[in-house]
Amino acid sequence: MSETSIQPLLDILFQGKALTREQTASLFSVLIQGEMNETVMAGMLMALKIRGETIEEISGAADAMRAAAKPFPYPESSRSQGVIDIVGTGGDGFNTINISTTAAFVAAAAGAKVAKHGNRSVSSKSGSSDLLAQFGIDLTMSPELASHCLEALNLCFLFAPHYHGGVKHAVPVRQTLKTRTLFNVLGPLINPARPEFMLLGVYSAELVTPIARVLQALGTQRAMVVHGSGLDEVALHGSTQVAELKDGEIIEYQLTPADFGVPQAHISELEGGEPAHNALITQQILQGHGCDAHTHAVAINAGCALYLCGLSESVKMGTALALSTIKTGKAYELLHKLATVSSQSQE
């Protein structure tokens, strides 16, 4: 479609009406092909934001992004077990340690297949990719090498800009608007590995159930969409609102640290810093030398991932498995193995 042919779709939007999934996919296909005027793009994104994006519209935008992504060669040996992503939208306004990224190493060391889709920082000083770079992990490794890492090590990291080149066309508009748009929730939905399982944190409690419905529409098998007392993670400092997708149904409930078998901590205990500082904290956690608050925050998130993958019968049992895995040092060994294997792409 050209910019001229999408005008009828824009007219629907500007009248305050909702688009279908297919119509939204058409609009976003034009955008990521670089064929949409920046003024038109800004108007489209703001029209969606002001009315409030529907499940169909978010799903359609994700469809377009997934279709245009660089393909990821899913290893056949992982298909029977299934793959999980542990990811957050970012944008929660807190500068915490890298909980979900560290949890990915723990879950993988405990037996889960983890394909983590990540980017540079959104709201904190250190996003998942910022952290990984500190350990010498090559973010631009080929899809084939990433697939090998997933098969051999149970873990790979997929750097979003490496797979979704078309997103660059929206960057100037997003920077000019300086407000959240649909793009702020799209990142976790467009993992090129298309994981069967998702632990997805969102920056607002209002997004928990809608994003669970989007995952349902996109065909995700099992998922927990969470918002933890202000964080886009499972919370150690308070309650966590959950929408769990299981057997095609969505169940809503709350979890507290007690449900995981760990004590509550204050949010200030989870404060992070620059990538180098956060890397040191991650290293300490994975070596089994982290402080209790840091270790528990990572374990409860890894525990939920292990529960979703079917490696534990409950989030409490998953947390116990995560804690015991940390003590073995296997997660720290995995960190070094991934750095070594990823460096092959630089040779």
UniProtKB/Swiss-Prot annotation:
GO terms for cellular component: cytosol. GO terms for biological process: L-tryptophan biosynthetic process. Mg(2+) 2 binds at D232, E233. Anthranilate 2 binds at R174. Pathway: Amino-acid biosynthesis; L-tryptophan biosynthesis; L-tryptophan from chorismate: step 2/5. Its cofactor is Mg(2+). It comes from the Bacteria. 5-phospho-alpha-D-ribose 1-diphosphate binds at residues 88, 91-92, 96, 98-101, 116-124, 128. Gene3D superfamilies: Nucleoside phosphorylase/phosphoribosyltransferase catalytic domain (3.40.1030.10), Transferase, Pyrimidine Nucleoside Phosphorylase, Chain C (1.20.970.10). Mg(2+) 1 binds at S100, E233. Binds 2 magnesium ions per monomer. Keywords: Amino-acid biosynthesis, Aromatic amino acid biosynthesis, Glycosyltransferase, Magnesium, Metal-binding, Transferase, Tryptophan biosynthesis. Anthranilate 1 binds at G88, N119. Its EC number is 2.4.2.18. It catalyses: N-(5-phospho-beta-D-ribosyl)anthranilate + diphosphate = 5-phospho-alpha-D-ribose 1-diphosphate + anthranilate. It holds the Pfam family Glycos_transf_3. GO terms for molecular function: anthranilate phosphoribosyltransferase activity; magnesium ion binding. Catalyzes the transfer of the phosphoribosyl group of 5-phosphorylribose-1-pyrophosphate (PRPP) to anthranilate to yield N-(5'-phosphoribosyl)-anthranilate (PRA). PANTHER family: ANTHRANILATE PHOSPHORIBOSYLTRANSFERASE. Belongs to the anthranilate phosphoribosyltransferase family. Homodimer. This is Anthranilate phosphoribosyltransferase. The gene is trpD.
